[in-house]
Protein backbone atom coordinates (compact mmCIF):
# COMPACT_ATOMS: atom_id res chain seq x y z
CA UNK A 1 0.00 0.00 0.00
CA UNK A 2 1.67 3.19 -1.20
CA UNK A 3 1.55 6.67 0.28
CA UNK A 4 0.79 7.95 -3.23
CA UNK A 5 -2.50 5.99 -3.14
CA UNK A 6 -3.74 8.70 -0.77
CA UNK A 7 -2.81 11.66 -2.94
CA UNK A 8 -5.32 14.17 -4.23
CA UNK A 9 -4.84 17.58 -5.83
CA UNK A 10 -5.85 20.43 -3.56
CA UNK A 11 -5.98 24.02 -4.82
CA UNK A 12 -4.25 26.36 -2.38
CA UNK A 13 -7.33 28.60 -2.11
CA UNK A 14 -9.27 25.75 -0.44
CA UNK A 15 -6.94 25.77 2.59
CA UNK A 16 -8.78 27.67 5.35
CA UNK A 17 -6.46 30.29 6.86
CA UNK A 18 -9.14 31.66 9.19
CA UNK A 19 -12.14 30.09 10.94
CA UNK A 20 -15.73 30.89 10.01
CA UNK A 21 -17.31 33.75 11.97
CA UNK A 22 -19.43 31.31 13.99
CA UNK A 23 -18.16 27.87 15.00
CA UNK A 24 -21.22 26.08 13.61
CA UNK A 25 -21.23 28.01 10.30
CA UNK A 26 -19.05 25.41 8.58
CA UNK A 27 -20.30 23.05 5.92
CA UNK A 28 -20.70 19.32 6.58
CA UNK A 29 -20.25 16.48 4.11
CA UNK A 30 -22.21 13.43 5.27
CA UNK A 31 -20.66 10.20 3.99
CA UNK A 32 -22.52 6.93 4.47
CA UNK A 33 -19.66 4.47 4.65
CA UNK A 34 -21.89 1.49 3.99
CA UNK A 35 -23.42 2.76 0.73
CA UNK A 36 -20.76 5.27 -0.35
CA UNK A 37 -23.50 7.91 -0.75
CA UNK A 38 -22.54 11.43 0.29
CA UNK A 39 -24.61 14.55 0.81
CA UNK A 40 -23.82 18.25 1.26
CA UNK A 41 -25.12 19.73 4.51
CA UNK A 42 -24.40 22.45 7.07
CA UNK A 43 -22.68 21.66 10.35
CA UNK A 44 -25.79 22.41 12.41
CA UNK A 45 -27.50 19.55 10.48
CA UNK A 46 -25.34 17.20 12.54
CA UNK A 47 -28.02 17.35 15.25
CA UNK A 48 -30.31 15.39 12.91
CA UNK A 49 -27.71 12.64 12.46
CA UNK A 50 -27.18 11.87 16.16
CA UNK A 51 -29.85 9.98 18.06
CA UNK A 52 -31.03 9.72 21.64
CA UNK A 53 -28.82 7.29 23.54
CA UNK A 54 -25.84 7.70 21.20
CA UNK A 55 -22.54 8.48 22.91
CA UNK A 56 -20.50 11.40 21.58
CA UNK A 57 -16.84 11.29 22.64
CA UNK A 58 -14.72 14.46 22.60
CA UNK A 59 -11.02 15.06 23.24
CA UNK A 60 -10.71 17.67 26.01
CA UNK A 61 -7.03 18.46 25.57
CA UNK A 62 -6.17 22.17 25.66
CA UNK A 63 -3.62 23.74 23.33
CA UNK A 64 -0.71 25.44 25.04
CA UNK A 65 0.83 28.58 23.46
CA UNK A 66 3.76 26.36 22.56
CA UNK A 67 5.68 28.50 20.06
CA UNK A 68 8.44 30.73 21.42
CA UNK A 69 10.74 33.07 19.54
CA UNK A 70 14.17 33.93 20.83
CA UNK A 71 17.89 33.84 20.34
CA UNK A 72 20.94 31.99 21.46
CA UNK A 73 22.96 33.83 24.08
CA UNK A 74 25.57 34.08 21.30
CA UNK A 75 23.06 36.02 19.18
CA UNK A 76 21.59 33.71 16.51
CA UNK A 77 17.79 33.78 16.11
CA UNK A 78 15.73 30.68 16.78
CA UNK A 79 12.20 29.35 17.12
CA UNK A 80 11.10 26.81 19.73
CA UNK A 81 8.01 24.62 19.50
CA UNK A 82 7.35 22.82 22.77
CA UNK A 83 6.27 19.23 22.09
CA UNK A 84 5.81 17.97 25.65
CA UNK A 85 6.14 19.47 29.12
CA UNK A 86 8.05 16.97 31.29
CA UNK A 87 7.72 18.73 34.64
CA UNK A 88 7.52 22.27 36.04
CA UNK A 89 10.91 23.27 34.63
CA UNK A 90 11.67 20.91 31.74
CA UNK A 91 10.22 20.28 28.32
CA UNK A 92 10.96 18.53 25.04
CA UNK A 93 10.92 20.86 22.05
CA UNK A 94 11.68 21.25 18.38
CA UNK A 95 14.24 24.00 17.79
CA UNK A 96 14.63 25.78 14.45
CA UNK A 97 17.88 27.67 14.07
CA UNK A 98 20.61 28.15 11.48
CA UNK A 99 22.73 25.87 13.69
CA UNK A 100 21.24 23.45 16.21
CA UNK A 101 22.10 24.45 19.79
CA UNK A 102 24.70 22.28 21.49
CA UNK A 103 24.35 20.72 24.91
CA UNK A 104 24.77 23.42 27.54
CA UNK A 105 23.77 26.23 25.18
CA UNK A 106 21.76 29.07 26.74
CA UNK A 107 18.62 30.27 24.95
CA UNK A 108 16.88 33.60 25.60
CA UNK A 109 13.16 33.30 24.85
CA UNK A 110 10.04 35.46 24.81
CA UNK A 111 11.54 38.92 24.28
CA UNK A 112 9.17 39.61 21.36
CA UNK A 113 6.27 39.64 23.85
CA UNK A 114 7.95 40.56 27.13
CA UNK A 115 10.29 43.23 25.77
CA UNK A 116 14.01 43.27 25.04
CA UNK A 117 15.98 42.29 28.11
CA UNK A 118 12.91 40.76 29.76
CA UNK A 119 13.06 37.32 28.18
CA UNK A 120 13.62 34.17 30.19
CA UNK A 121 16.45 31.69 29.86
CA UNK A 122 16.53 28.00 29.08
CA UNK A 123 19.47 25.61 28.88
CA UNK A 124 19.64 22.84 26.27
CA UNK A 125 20.51 19.85 28.45
CA UNK A 126 20.14 16.88 26.08
CA UNK A 127 19.04 15.86 22.60
CA UNK A 128 16.62 13.01 21.88
CA UNK A 129 16.62 12.46 18.10
CA UNK A 130 14.72 15.46 16.66
CA UNK A 131 13.76 16.83 20.08
CA UNK A 132 15.78 19.01 22.44
CA UNK A 133 15.40 18.84 26.21
CA UNK A 134 15.23 22.34 27.64
CA UNK A 135 15.57 23.32 31.30
CA UNK A 136 14.01 26.65 32.27
CA UNK A 137 15.84 28.57 34.99
CA UNK A 138 12.87 30.66 36.11
CA UNK A 139 10.96 29.94 39.32
CA UNK A 140 7.67 30.00 37.40
CA UNK A 141 6.46 26.70 35.91
CA UNK A 142 6.88 26.14 32.17
CA UNK A 143 3.12 26.38 31.57
CA UNK A 144 3.04 29.86 33.17
CA UNK A 145 5.97 31.05 31.06
CA UNK A 146 4.27 29.80 27.91
CA UNK A 147 1.03 31.58 28.83
CA UNK A 148 2.98 34.84 29.19
CA UNK A 149 5.27 34.66 26.17
CA UNK A 150 4.13 31.83 23.92
CA UNK A 151 2.30 32.03 20.59
CA UNK A 152 -0.51 29.73 19.49
CA UNK A 153 1.16 26.98 17.43
CA UNK A 154 -0.89 27.31 14.26
CA UNK A 155 -0.18 24.53 11.74
CA UNK A 156 2.35 25.33 9.01
CA UNK A 157 -0.26 25.24 6.23
CA UNK A 158 -2.20 28.15 7.78
CA UNK A 159 0.85 30.15 6.76
CA UNK A 160 0.33 33.33 8.79
CA UNK A 161 1.37 34.65 12.21
CA UNK A 162 -0.98 33.87 15.07
CA UNK A 163 -3.43 36.62 16.05
CA UNK A 164 -5.29 37.41 19.27
CA UNK A 165 -8.46 35.73 17.95
CA UNK A 166 -6.60 32.42 17.61
CA UNK A 167 -6.25 32.27 21.40
CA UNK A 168 -9.97 31.47 21.50
CA UNK A 169 -10.75 30.00 18.09
CA UNK A 170 -7.88 27.48 18.04
CA UNK A 171 -9.30 25.95 21.25
CA UNK A 172 -12.43 23.85 21.63
CA UNK A 173 -15.04 25.34 23.97
CA UNK A 174 -14.69 22.31 26.26
CA UNK A 175 -10.87 22.15 26.33
CA UNK A 176 -9.65 21.50 29.84
CA UNK A 177 -6.38 19.56 30.17
CA UNK A 178 -3.29 21.55 29.11
CA UNK A 179 -0.83 19.65 26.96
CA UNK A 180 -1.54 19.75 23.20
CA UNK A 181 0.50 21.64 20.62
CA UNK A 182 -2.24 21.27 18.00
CA UNK A 183 -6.01 21.47 18.38
CA UNK A 184 -8.28 18.43 17.98
CA UNK A 185 -9.89 20.32 15.13
CA UNK A 186 -13.17 18.43 14.60
CA UNK A 187 -14.21 19.81 17.98
CA UNK A 188 -13.72 23.42 16.89
CA UNK A 189 -17.14 23.32 15.17
CA UNK A 190 -19.05 22.76 18.42
CA UNK A 191 -20.29 25.72 20.46
CA UNK A 192 -21.99 25.59 23.85
CA UNK A 193 -25.57 25.96 22.50
CA UNK A 194 -24.97 22.95 20.20
CA UNK A 195 -23.70 20.87 23.12
CA UNK A 196 -26.78 21.84 25.14
CA UNK A 197 -29.09 20.87 22.25
CA UNK A 198 -27.39 17.48 22.01
CA UNK A 199 -27.84 16.88 25.74
CA UNK A 200 -31.49 17.98 25.54
CA UNK A 201 -32.00 15.42 22.78
CA UNK A 202 -30.78 12.65 25.09
CA UNK A 203 -27.34 12.29 23.52
CA UNK A 204 -24.69 11.21 26.03
CA UNK A 205 -21.32 12.96 26.14
CA UNK A 206 -17.92 11.73 27.30
CA UNK A 207 -14.38 13.11 27.26
CA UNK A 208 -11.07 11.42 26.61
CA UNK A 209 -7.70 13.19 26.56
CA UNK A 210 -5.05 12.90 23.87
CA UNK A 211 -2.36 15.56 23.80
CA UNK A 212 -1.91 16.21 20.10
CA UNK A 213 1.76 16.54 19.19
CA UNK A 214 3.53 18.34 16.36
CA UNK A 215 4.06 14.93 14.77
CA UNK A 216 0.50 15.11 13.50
CA UNK A 217 1.77 17.55 10.82
CA UNK A 218 4.84 15.54 9.84
CA UNK A 219 4.71 14.12 6.30
CA UNK A 220 4.94 10.37 5.77
CA UNK A 221 8.49 10.03 4.47
CA UNK A 222 8.36 6.46 3.14
CA UNK A 223 6.83 5.06 -0.05
CA UNK A 224 5.14 2.03 1.52
CA UNK A 225 2.91 3.00 4.44
CA UNK A 226 3.80 -0.24 6.26
CA UNK A 227 7.30 1.22 6.71
CA UNK A 228 5.97 4.34 8.46
CA UNK A 229 6.86 4.81 12.13
CA UNK A 230 3.97 6.56 13.86
CA UNK A 231 4.69 9.32 16.38
CA UNK A 232 3.64 8.72 20.01
CA UNK A 233 1.13 10.86 21.91
CA UNK A 234 -0.15 10.57 25.47
CA UNK A 235 -3.78 9.46 25.84
CA UNK A 236 -6.20 8.88 28.71
CA UNK A 237 -9.45 6.89 28.66
CA UNK A 238 -10.96 6.72 32.16
CA UNK A 239 -13.03 3.98 33.78
CA UNK A 240 -16.05 6.29 33.61
CA UNK A 241 -15.70 6.57 29.83
CA UNK A 242 -15.22 2.80 29.52
CA UNK A 243 -18.45 2.31 31.49
CA UNK A 244 -20.29 4.74 29.18
CA UNK A 245 -19.01 2.93 26.09
CA UNK A 246 -20.02 -0.49 27.41
CA UNK A 247 -23.47 0.79 28.40
CA UNK A 248 -23.94 2.33 24.94
CA UNK A 249 -22.94 -0.90 23.20
CA UNK A 250 -25.26 -2.90 25.46
CA UNK A 251 -28.27 -0.86 24.32
CA UNK A 252 -27.38 -1.09 20.63
CA UNK A 253 -26.67 2.63 20.33
CA UNK A 254 -23.67 4.19 18.58
CA UNK A 255 -20.31 5.39 19.84
CA UNK A 256 -19.50 8.52 17.82
CA UNK A 257 -15.97 9.93 17.96
CA UNK A 258 -15.40 13.65 17.48
CA UNK A 259 -12.06 13.77 15.71
CA UNK A 260 -9.34 11.32 14.79
CA UNK A 261 -7.64 11.90 18.16
CA UNK A 262 -10.75 10.60 19.95
CA UNK A 263 -10.75 7.59 17.61
CA UNK A 264 -7.09 6.88 18.32
CA UNK A 265 -7.62 7.17 22.09
CA UNK A 266 -10.64 4.85 22.14
CA UNK A 267 -9.21 2.28 19.75
CA UNK A 268 -5.88 2.29 21.64
CA UNK A 269 -7.78 1.42 24.81
CA UNK A 270 -9.64 -1.34 22.97
CA UNK A 271 -6.46 -2.70 21.41
CA UNK A 272 -4.72 -2.87 24.79
CA UNK A 273 -7.77 -4.50 26.43
CA UNK A 274 -7.98 -7.21 23.78
CA UNK A 275 -4.92 -8.88 25.33
CA UNK A 276 -6.98 -9.28 28.53
CA UNK A 277 -9.98 -10.64 26.64
CA UNK A 278 -11.97 -7.42 27.17
CA UNK A 279 -13.72 -5.15 24.69
CA UNK A 280 -12.19 -2.03 26.25
CA UNK A 281 -10.47 -1.05 29.50
CA UNK A 282 -9.06 2.17 31.00
CA UNK A 283 -5.96 3.46 29.23
CA UNK A 284 -3.33 5.90 30.51
CA UNK A 285 -0.29 5.68 28.28
CA UNK A 286 1.49 6.83 25.15
CA UNK A 287 -0.06 5.53 21.96
CA UNK A 288 1.41 5.22 18.49
CA UNK A 289 -1.60 3.43 17.00
CA UNK A 290 -1.66 3.65 13.20
CA UNK A 291 -5.02 2.98 11.56
CA UNK A 292 -4.91 2.48 7.79
CA UNK A 293 -6.99 0.43 5.30
CA UNK A 294 -7.11 -3.16 6.47
CA UNK A 295 -7.21 -2.22 10.17
CA UNK A 296 -10.41 -2.74 12.17
CA UNK A 297 -12.28 -0.39 14.50
CA UNK A 298 -13.52 -2.25 17.57
CA UNK A 299 -15.51 0.54 19.20
CA UNK A 300 -16.23 3.56 17.01
CA UNK A 301 -19.41 3.47 14.90
CA UNK A 302 -19.39 6.98 13.44
CA UNK A 303 -16.94 9.84 13.14
CA UNK A 304 -16.96 13.64 12.95
CA UNK A 305 -13.74 14.85 11.34
CA UNK A 306 -12.23 17.66 9.29
CA UNK A 307 -10.72 17.30 5.81
CA UNK A 308 -7.11 16.16 6.03
CA UNK A 309 -3.87 16.61 4.12
CA UNK A 310 -3.13 14.49 1.05
CA UNK A 311 -0.95 11.46 1.86
CA UNK A 312 -1.33 12.02 5.62
CA UNK A 313 -1.89 9.34 8.26
CA UNK A 314 -5.25 10.99 8.98
CA UNK A 315 -6.69 10.48 5.50
CA UNK A 316 -5.44 6.89 5.84
CA UNK A 317 -7.44 6.55 9.07
CA UNK A 318 -10.57 7.92 7.38
CA UNK A 319 -10.04 5.50 4.47
CA UNK A 320 -9.80 2.60 6.91
CA UNK A 321 -13.07 3.70 8.52
CA UNK A 322 -15.18 4.62 5.48
CA UNK A 323 -13.47 2.49 2.84
CA UNK A 324 -10.72 3.67 0.52
CA UNK A 325 -12.80 4.31 -2.60
CA UNK A 326 -15.61 5.95 -0.65
CA UNK A 327 -13.12 8.30 0.98
CA UNK A 328 -11.25 9.31 -2.16
CA UNK A 329 -14.53 9.90 -4.05
CA UNK A 330 -15.86 12.03 -1.18
CA UNK A 331 -12.62 14.05 -1.10
CA UNK A 332 -12.77 14.58 -4.86
CA UNK A 333 -16.32 15.87 -4.45
CA UNK A 334 -15.21 18.13 -1.58
CA UNK A 335 -12.56 19.71 -3.81
CA UNK A 336 -15.02 20.19 -6.69
CA UNK A 337 -17.65 21.63 -4.31
CA UNK A 338 -15.03 23.96 -2.80
CA UNK A 339 -15.18 22.76 0.79
CA UNK A 340 -12.65 24.43 3.09
CA UNK A 341 -9.80 22.14 4.17
CA UNK A 342 -7.71 21.41 7.26
CA UNK A 343 -7.78 22.80 10.82
CA UNK A 344 -10.01 25.85 10.29
CA UNK A 345 -11.97 24.18 7.49
CA UNK A 346 -15.22 22.26 7.07
CA UNK A 347 -16.22 18.88 8.49
CA UNK A 348 -17.41 15.40 7.57
CA UNK A 349 -19.80 13.06 9.36
CA UNK A 350 -19.06 9.44 8.49
CA UNK A 351 -20.96 6.26 9.30
CA UNK A 352 -18.58 3.30 9.51
CA UNK A 353 -18.31 1.04 6.48
CA UNK A 354 -18.77 -2.56 7.73
CA UNK A 355 -17.06 -3.76 4.53
CA UNK A 356 -14.08 -1.40 4.70
CA UNK A 357 -11.67 -4.33 5.05
CA UNK A 358 -12.54 -5.24 1.46
CA UNK A 359 -12.12 -1.70 0.15
CA UNK A 360 -8.36 -1.30 -0.15
CA UNK A 361 -6.18 0.67 -2.60
Curated annotation (Swiss-Prot):
One of its GO terms (biological process) is tRNA wobble guanine modification. GO terms for molecular function: S-adenosylmethionine:tRNA ribosyltransferase-isomerase activity. GO terms for cellular component: cytoplasm. It comes from the Bacteria. It is found in: Cytoplasm. Pathway: tRNA modification; tRNA-queuosine biosynthesis. Gene3D superfamilies: QueA-like. Its EC number is 2.4.99.17. It is an enzyme of class 2 (transferase). InterPro entries: QueA, QueA_dom1, QueA_dom2, QueA_sf. It catalyses: 7-aminomethyl-7-carbaguanosine(34) in tRNA + S-adenosyl-L-methionine = epoxyqueuosine(34) in tRNA + adenine + L-methionine + 2 H(+). It holds the Pfam family Queuosine_synth. Keywords: Cytoplasm, Queuosine biosynthesis, S-adenosyl-L-methionine, Transferase. Monomer. Transfers and isomerizes the ribose moiety from AdoMet to the 7-aminomethyl group of 7-deazaguanine (preQ1-tRNA) to give epoxyqueuosine (oQ-tRNA). NCBIfam families: PRK00147.1, queA. Belongs to the QueA family. PANTHER family: S-ADENOSYLMETHIONINE:TRNA RIBOSYLTRANSFERASE-ISOMERASE. This is S-adenosylmethionine:tRNA ribosyltransferase-isomerase. It comes from Actinobacillus pleuropneumoniae serotype 7 (strain AP76).
